[in-house]
Amino acid sequence: MKDDLRKIDKILLFLVTLMCIFGLVMIYSASSASTILRYYVAPNHFFVRQLIVLVVGYVFGFFVILFPTNRYKFLAYLYSLFVLVLLMYVLVKGKIAGNAQSWIAIGPFNLQPSEFAKSALILFMAVFYNNLSKRNTKNLSLYFIPLLLAGVYMLLTLLQPDWGSAAIIGAIAILTFLSVPMIKKNILKIMKIFVIGIIVLALALLYKGGNILSSNKLSRLNFKAPCTRYQEESGYQVCNALIAISNGGLFGVGLGQSSQKYLYLPESHTDMIFPIICEELGSIAGALTILLYGVILFKIFKIAKRSDNLRTSILAYGTFWYFTLHIFINLFGLLALIPLTGVPLPFLSYGGSYTLNAIFLIFVTERVAIENKKNKLKREIMSI
C-alpha cells in the first residue's frame, strides 16, 4: 500500500486539491447572495454540500488508487449497465429542474446519471478495447460497439433534454475511439464511415430538426453580440458573464464583492463561476486558473503517453478528453464563442454528480501513473 502511494503523481494530486479548495472558497462567495435571495437557505448551504461531496470523493479515491486496473473487467461492464438503467429511470421518475428531467432525488441530494455516463463510457472503452486487442481480431465492426453504447447514452440524455452532456459523451467516445491503435491503422476506412454517418445525421436534422431543436436551443446558435441579443433575452447569461469579467479588470473588486452574483448572473456558483472569479479576483486570477488547468491537462496527457498497455492508455486519454472538453465548452460558451450549454467547470463549479466523477477519474489516472512506474521498474529489472 505504502509503495503504491509513493508512486502517485504528487504534482497532479496537489494541483487538483488546490483547485478544489479554491473552488470551495469561490462557491461560498458566488452563492452567498442567491442562497438567501433565491433559495432561502443558509449562506454556506452550497459550500457545505460541496465539501461533503469532496470528502466522499477523496475517501473513495483512496480505494481507487489501491485497486489494479486489470480488475476493472467485470466492474466496467456492470457500471455501464447500471448507468444505462439510471438513464432510462430518470426519464420516467426523474426530478425536473431548469426545463430538464435529469436528476434522481436521493434524500437531500440529487443524482445526475448523465454525468456518470461519461466515466462509465471511459471505463467500458478501456476494458473492451483492451480485451479486443488480445484477441488480435481484424474485424473493424467490433470496434464500433462502444460507439453504439455512447449513441444510446447520448439519445437517452438528449431526451431529458441535456444537450451539453450529450455532446460531451459523443465527443469523448469519438476522440477516445480515434486513439485506439487499430483505428489509427485503418483511419481512411473509418473516415468513410464517419462521413456517411454525418450525411445521414444531417438529412435527419433537415427532416426533423424543427421537432428536435426548440426555439430556445436555436437562439443559442445566434452569435451576434450577446448584450445586443439581451434585448431578445437569448443572450442574457453571456451578457452578464461578460459584464462580470469587465467589472473585475486586472485585479478584481475583492473577494465576496461581486455585484453580478446578486441574481444578475444565473447559477453563479455552478457553470457561471468563472466570471465571478474574474470579477472578484481579476483577470490575472482568471488567467492563473486557466494556466493551472493547462498544467493539470499536461500531467494527465503525460501519464497517458507513458502507458504501455491499451487499457491504461485509454483510461488516461479518456480522462484527458473528459476534462479538456468541459474546460473548453464552459469557457468558450461564456465568452460567446460557442452556444452556452450549462457545462460545469472542473473542480470549481458546484455539483455533486459532476464533482464525484471528476475526482474519481483523477484517482483512476493516479492508479495508471502507479502502474506505469511499476511496469517501468519491472522492465529495468528484467534488462539487468
Where are these regions (language model features)?
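Hydrophobic, glycine- and aromatic-enriched re-entrant/interface helices and adjoining loop segments
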Residues: 97, 103, 189-285
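Alpha-helical transmembrane segments of multi-pass membrane proteins, especially transporters
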Residues: 142, 146, 169, 244, ...
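Loop-to-helix entry and N-terminal half of a specific, functionally important transmembrane alpha helix
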Residues: 302-342, 348
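Hydrophobic alpha-helical transmembrane segments
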Residues: 52-60, 280-297
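Hydrophobic alpha-helical segments of polytopic membrane proteins
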Residues: 77-84, 140-156, 163-209
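Membrane-helix boundary/helix-loop-helix interface segments in multi-pass membrane proteins
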Residues: 2-12, 18, 25-28, 33-160, ...
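Interfacial segments of multi-pass membrane proteins
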Residues: 167-187, 256-285, 344-359
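Alpha-helical transmembrane segments of polytopic integral membrane proteins
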Residues: 21-27, 122, 126, 294-297, ...
